[in-house]
């Protein structure tokens, strides 16, 4: 395992300035942040947990952690079964659960733009109110959409409709350096540059943190 630096009080102060009132240390860190729903793969408490609220906050946090060589683990609802959100090196956990807004629908292009903390079930129900369907249907309905995309979740409908990968049009990602990158487009076809979008889908948080998604919808049957 790579060697990382310890989180110092000075680093905690810098993080608190970015996300005041939403940076937790010591006994204030929720025990759930030490694992996902399959603790058989191991548990470890992070040194710091942060409830992020925006792309800009996550960017600023990542810049500090990158400069100080602090390990970072991104976490959604923690419903996974493979230990992917377990902070095995300690460090900082960034939770995206407070980034839960359905930002907008584009009925001309049949897309919806959401933050990564929106739950799959919440989008499915809201889309139906618009006469639209978000087809991916993984087994865990209360997983976040950011987590679904990070794992390229499938489900029973995959045989007919495909997996999550087939419904991601665009995303905003914060790289480990803190750089903010926009990938993809809301339209159904674009040939501008490399398909970085498909590199991110299924990467399980190893390449960056997804902070916004534009997803494809279809007319509800």
Each model region followed by its residue ranges:
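N-terminal flexible segment immediately upstream of the FAD-binding catalytic core
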Residues: 1-63, 79-110
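Pocket-edge structural micro-motifs
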Residues: 25-27, 52, 74, 96, ...
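Residue-level detector of family-conserved "landmark" positions at structurally sensitive sites
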Residues: 25-26, 75, 123, 137
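Short, basic and Ser/Thr-rich N-terminal targeting/leader segments
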Residues: 66-68, 75-77, 143, 167
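Residue-level detector of anion-binding/catalytic polar loops
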Residues: 70-71, 133
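Glycine-rich, histidine-containing beta strand-loop boundary motifs that form or position
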Residues: 74-78, 85, 96, 116, ...
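FAD-binding subdomain of flavoenzyme oxidoreductases
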Residues: 101-105, 111-221
């Amino acid at each position: 395992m790579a060697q990382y630096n310890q989180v110092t009080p000075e680093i905690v102060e810098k993080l608190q300035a970015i996300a005041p009132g939403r940076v937790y240390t010591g006994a204030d860190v929720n025990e759930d942040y030490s694992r996902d729903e399959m603790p058989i793969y191991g548990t470890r408490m992070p040194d710091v947990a942060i409830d992020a609220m925006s792309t800009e906050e996550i960017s600023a946090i990542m810049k500090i952690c990158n400069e100080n060589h602090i390990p970072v683990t991104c976490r959604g609802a923690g419903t996974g079964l493979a230990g992917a959100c377990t902070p095995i090196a300690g460090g900082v956990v960034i939770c995206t659960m407070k980034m839960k807004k359905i930002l907008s629908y584009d009925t001309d292009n049949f897309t919806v733009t959401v933050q990564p903390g929106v739950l799959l079930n919440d989008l499915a129900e809201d889309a139906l109110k618009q006469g639209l369907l978000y087809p991916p249907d993984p087994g865990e309905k209360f997983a976040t959409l950011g987590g679904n995309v990070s794992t390229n979740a499938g489900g029973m409908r995959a045989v007919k409709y495909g997996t999550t990968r087939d419904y991601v049009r665009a995303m905003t990602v914060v790289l480990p350096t803190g750089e903010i990158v926009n990938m993809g487009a809301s339209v159904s076809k674009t040939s501008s540059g490399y398909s970085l979008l498909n590199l991110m889908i299924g990467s399980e948080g190893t390449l960056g943190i997804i902070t916004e998604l534009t997803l494809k919808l279809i007319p509800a049957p």
